[in-house]
């Protein structure tokens, strides 16, 4: 958080936008939407070796408690309405991370009749994490990119 000025009396001044965005980046609660093998890497990123808790990332089981959705794996046509329904149940502000080649653009199954060619056709995606499957480090980098994106947004309308 950028501090605008520190006064001699011990006060810290900053803008409300920067304060709100600082709290949002330090307490991101993702809801996992694991569909295929990328979900294993997502679980690996949440385990003790990578420990996403140090970034303020705590996995939540309910869409009403989460503000980030991680779509990991192959999205089929049959699962697309469920993805949209879960996304609509999330409270604002909400963000989406697309994890893996299949979630990004269909991946290996791109030409299959039953595969959605990218989850961005169903929900708006903020960060794309490439790979088949992407490593836990790649997901952590994607989370850091999302935190940078949140820091740059204007929260309070002017």
UniProtKB/Swiss-Prot annotation:
Cell location: Cell inner membrane
Pfam family, one: Oxidored_q6
Gene3D superfamilies xrefs: 3.40.50.12280
Catalytic activity: a quinone + NADH + 5 H(+)(in) = a quinol + NAD(+) + 4 H(+)(out)
Comment on bound cofactor: Binds 1 [4Fe-4S] cluster.
Keywords: 4Fe-4S, Cell inner membrane, Cell membrane, Iron, Iron-sulfur, Membrane, Metal-binding, NAD, Quinone, Translocase, Transport, Ubiquinone
GO cellular component terms listed in the entry, alphabetical order: plasma membrane; respiratory chain complex I
Molecular-function annotations in GO: 4 iron, 4 sulfur cluster binding; iron ion binding; NADH dehydrogenase (ubiquinone) activity; NADH:ubiquinone reductase (non-electrogenic) activity; quinone binding
Function as written in the Swiss-Prot or TrEMBL entry: NDH-1 shuttles electrons from NADH, via FMN and iron-sulfur (Fe-S) centers, to quinones in the respiratory chain. Couples the redox reaction to proton translocation (for every two electrons transferred, four hydrogen ions are translocated across the cytoplasmic membrane), and thus conserves the redox energy in a proton gradient.
Name the record gives this protein: NADH-quinone oxidoreductase subunit B
The organism of origin for this protein: Herminiimonas arsenicoxydans
């Amino acid at each position: 958080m950028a501090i605008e000025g520190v006064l001699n009396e011990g006060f810290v001044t900053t803008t409300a936008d920067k304060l709100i965005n600082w709290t949002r980046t330090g307490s991101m609660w993702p809801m996992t939407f694991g569909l295929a093998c990328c979900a294993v890497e997502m679980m690996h990123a949440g385990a003790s070796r990578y420990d996403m808790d140090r970034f303020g990332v705590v996995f939540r089981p309910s869409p009403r408690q989460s503000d980030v959705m991680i779509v990991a794996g192959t999205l089929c046509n049959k699962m697309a309405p469920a993805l949209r329904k879960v996304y609509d149940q999330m409270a604002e502000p909400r963000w989406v991370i697309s994890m893996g080649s299949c979630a990004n653009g269909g991946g290996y199954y791109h030409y299959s009749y039953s595969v959605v060619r990218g989850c961005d056709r169903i929900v708006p995606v903020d960060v794309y994490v490439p790979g088949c499957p992407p490593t836990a480090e790649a997901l952590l980098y994607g989370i850091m990119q999302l935190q940078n994106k949140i820091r740059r947004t204007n929260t309070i309308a002017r």
